[in-house]
C-alpha cells in the first residue's frame, strides 16, 4: 500500500477479561496480547491500527462516529445480539467492516446465533480464537491493496 491506511479495531463488552474468562470458549490469550500481535501485523503492512475496547456501548459508537479509518474490524461481543445502535453507527459512517468472534457462536446457546451485524459485514470470522483477528486483518490488507490498484 502506497499511503498508510488506517483500521479501527473495536472490541465490545467483557473482552477486557480475555485470558481468564471462560477459556474453554475464548482461549487463553489476553486482549493485550491479541492487540499487540495485530499492531505488529499492521506495522509490517504499513497500516495504522487503532483500538478501542469498552463495556459501554456509547463509547464504541462514538469511536466509530469519530474515526477516519478505511476499514473496521469489530468483535461486538454481547452487543452482537442486542445492539441496533452499534449496527446503525457502522452503517452511518459507511466504512466496510469484518465481524470477528473468538468462539463459534453457532455452536453455543440459541440466543447467540443471531447477529445484528452479519448481514452488513464484508465478512464474518468465528470460532477460530485469537487467530480469527489475524485472518480478519489479512483480509483487510488484501482488500485495501486491491482497492488501491483500481
UniProtKB/Swiss-Prot annotation:
Domain of life: Bacteria
Organism of derivation: Shewanella piezotolerans (strain WP3 / JCM 13877)
EC number: 4.2.1.10
UniProt binding sites for substrate: 75, 81, 88, 102-103, 112
InterPro entries tied to this protein: DHquinase_II, DHquinase_II_CS, DHquinase_II_sf
Function: Catalyzes a trans-dehydration via an enolate intermediate.
Annotated PANTHER family: CATABOLIC 3-DEHYDROQUINASE
Reactions performed catalytically: 3-dehydroquinate = 3-dehydroshikimate + H2O
Keyword field contains Amino-acid biosynthesis: yes
Enzyme class: lyase
Active site: 26, 101
The protein's name: 3-dehydroquinate dehydratase
Record-annotated disulphide pairs: none
GO BP annotation list: amino acid biosynthetic process; aromatic amino acid family biosynthetic process; chorismate biosynthetic process; quinate catabolic process
Keyword Cell inner membrane found: no
GO molecular function, one term: 3-dehydroquinate dehydratase activity
Database matches in HAMAP family: AroQ
Residue(s) at site: Transition state stabilizer: 21
Amino acid at each position: 500500500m502506497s499511503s498508510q491506511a488506517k483500521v479501527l479495531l473495536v472490541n465490545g463488552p467483557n473482552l477486557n477479561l480475555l485470558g481468564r474468562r471462560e477459556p474453554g470458549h475464548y482461549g487463553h490469550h489476553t486482549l493485550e496480547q491479541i492487540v499487540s500481535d495485530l499492531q505488529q501485523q499492521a506495522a509490517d503492512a504499513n497500516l495504522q491500527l487503532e483500538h478501542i475496547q469498552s463495556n459501554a456501548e456509547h463509547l464504541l459508537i462514538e469511536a466509530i462516529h469519530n474515526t477516519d479509518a478505511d476499514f473496521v474490524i469489530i468483535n461486538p461481543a454481547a452487543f452482537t445480539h442486542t445492539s441496533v445502535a452499534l449496527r446503525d453507527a457502522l452503517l452511518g459512517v459507511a466504512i466496510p467492516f469484518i465481524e470477528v468472534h473468538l468462539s463459534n457462536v453457532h455452536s453455543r446457546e440459541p440466543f447467540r446465533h443471531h447477529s445484528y451485524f452479519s448481514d452488513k459485514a464484508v465478512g464474518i470470522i468465528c470460532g477460530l480464537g485469537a487467530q480469527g483477528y489475524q485472518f480478519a486483518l489479512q483480509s483487510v490488507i488484501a482488500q485495501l491493496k486491491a482497492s488501491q490498484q483500481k
